[in-house]
Amino acid sequence: NDYLLISQAPAFALLERLDQIDPAFLIALCRKAAGYEAIPGASDITADLATRDLHPILSTDPRRAARIALPTDGSRPDMPAFSDRAFDGWMQAQRPANLPQDLPFLGFGLYGEKRSVYTAAQFADAASEERRTRHLGIDIFAPAGTAIHAPLDGVVESVTYNADPLDYGHTLILRHATAQGRPFFTLYGHLGGSLPGLCTPGQAIKAGDLIAHLGDWHENGGWAPHLHLQVVTSLLTQAGNFFGVGHDSLWDTWADISPDANLLLRLEPESFRLDPEPPEALLALRQKVIGPSLSVSYREKLKIVRGRGAWLIDHTGRRYLDTVNNITHVGHCHPHVVAAIARQ
């Protein structure tokens, strides 16, 4: 009758909408709403990664390379969008003038950042009325052709070319396991055409193996050359591709599915934020209040913000080996020394 048809219509509409959503993602949502981890064992995976010995992703360890943080929140108003070909020239203009050409200059895009660039159809779905805009990986901007190495042992899960505009282009997913045998995955997006010749599904990979090269605009989905690096605790029901951005309102669920990829890079937090007082500003102040008899070293002035172990860390998160200060005999910020100072 008419009454039943009217009351059933919303139910059928809901069923049609649910049918468009990854069923494993629906389970993850329900688990999180019930107070559990969205993915069983997600915290075990992050704990395991935090203690692993890892091989650098690039030939030069990103922790020691010159770099720049690339937030898209408007704090760099002159920066073109990552999908704008003008970005390449802008990035080159940021390179320090005295940096030797054989040394890398990297840009880092932020995990968990809300971005407005994701306008293509694949970033909208039935799980929410909002678009998926919150970044689930870390971006490493470097020249096309830059070699990518496996950070840890694994097996090739998939090698795919995702051809949609603003998708990943050539995409690699590796399967790994924790010390307790729990599986997890790492995803490498925006790769070059050399990928199929380097990796095949089922192939065993050792930490440090060459697995890919960065792709150029025509093969990486239409982006400035960069690596999208992502940790995935469960592929849900996806194959060959995976969500690179999540819904802001469902972030607590997405963060269990794809925790911070800095677990693989171990970059200092300064690598992902802008310093409100760059070295140039401090140098100008210094010239006003300190006499010239106290000189400053290096042509490109360093702003050291803290130390850790044998390393000094500048305002961009770059590490410098400290071969000057005696404190490196025990290490900067040694917990026993810090505790003794606090007691005294």
Q: Where are the predicted features?
A:
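Short loop/turn microsegments at loop-to-beta-strand junctions
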Residues: 145-146, 300, 306-310, 316
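Polar/charged, compositionally biased leader and regulatory segments
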Residues: 1-139, 250-276
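Active-site-adjacent loop/helix segments that line or gate small-molecule/cofactor pockets in enzymes
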Residues: 277-308, 326
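Glycine-rich loop-to-alpha-helix module at the N-terminal edge of alpha/beta enzyme cores
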Residues: 320-344
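Acidic, glycine-rich catalytic/binding loops that coordinate metals and/or anionic ligands
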Residues: 63-66, 197-209, 213-219, 223-276
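Short, glycine/small-residue-enriched coil/turn segments at secondary-structure junctions
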Residues: 98-101, 128-165
